[in-house]
Amino acid sequence: MPWIVGVSGASGTPYAAAVLRALLAAGESVDLVVSRASRLTLLDETGISFRDAHWRHDLREWLARGADGKPDTFDADVSGVRHWSAGDLAAGPSSGSYPTKGMLIVPASTACVAGVALGLSKDLLQRAASVTLKERRRLVVAVRETPLDGRTLRHLVTLDDAGASVVPASPAFYAGATHIQDLVDFVAGRVLDAAGVGHGLYRRWRGDLGGARPTG
């Protein structure tokens, strides 16, 4: 069964790329939903246009770049990815009878959070998230906005009460980050932790003052 990965319009497309790379590296299959707003963000942050007609090519180009926009070493094999148009409300993930392991929304904008919390289902991303909740599957929401007002905080509490895991895109610094990608990978790793997916994206805290930094 696949994981659904939804990409909303918040800044933070490198987080989505890191999660996708890790899922594929772990041998997971992915159903990808890229919202209209996120395509504008992706273009602004990476210069990549994500087009439905050429999504495999565009996804390979996206995943082959690091957070700094430079070429990465990732072998962008996207054979494990199935793309669904965000406007296709008849797509598989719109139904509870379509089997999935759960859904990761990364990054999640406040508009996306509100839509899911209120059950609006304005597009496939929101509909798939609502289905994930009603089917009691794992939903991880990586909210990437600051500051957060009372309305958004209440929406996040609603999602938590409904069974979602809310993972703010807030990197930690104890892992000895030296590059932007290290910070991105930490957040992506925490998203995957919440989903129960194994990975090696960051060094974990060991319970001493040395933290997760390498020794020797």
UniProtKB/Swiss-Prot annotation:
Pfam families: Flavoprotein. GO terms for molecular function: carboxy-lyase activity; flavin prenyltransferase activity. Dimethylallyl phosphate binds at Y174, R190. Its EC number is 2.5.1.129. The keyword Transmembrane does not apply. Keywords: Flavoprotein, FMN, Prenyltransferase, Transferase. It catalyses: dimethylallyl phosphate + FMNH2 = prenylated FMNH2 + phosphate. InterPro entries: Flavin_trans-like, Flavoprotein, UbiX-like. The keyword Ribosomal protein does not apply. FMN binds at G9, A10, S11, S35, R144. Flavin prenyltransferase that catalyzes the synthesis of the prenylated FMN cofactor (prenyl-FMN) for 4-hydroxy-3-polyprenylbenzoic acid decarboxylase UbiD. The prenyltransferase is metal-independent and links a dimethylallyl moiety from dimethylallyl monophosphate (DMAP) to the flavin N5 and C6 atoms of FMN. Belongs to the UbiX/PAD1 family. This is Flavin prenyltransferase UbiX. The lineage of its organism: Bacteria, Bacillati, Actinomycetota, Actinomycetes, Kitasatosporales. The gene is ubiX.
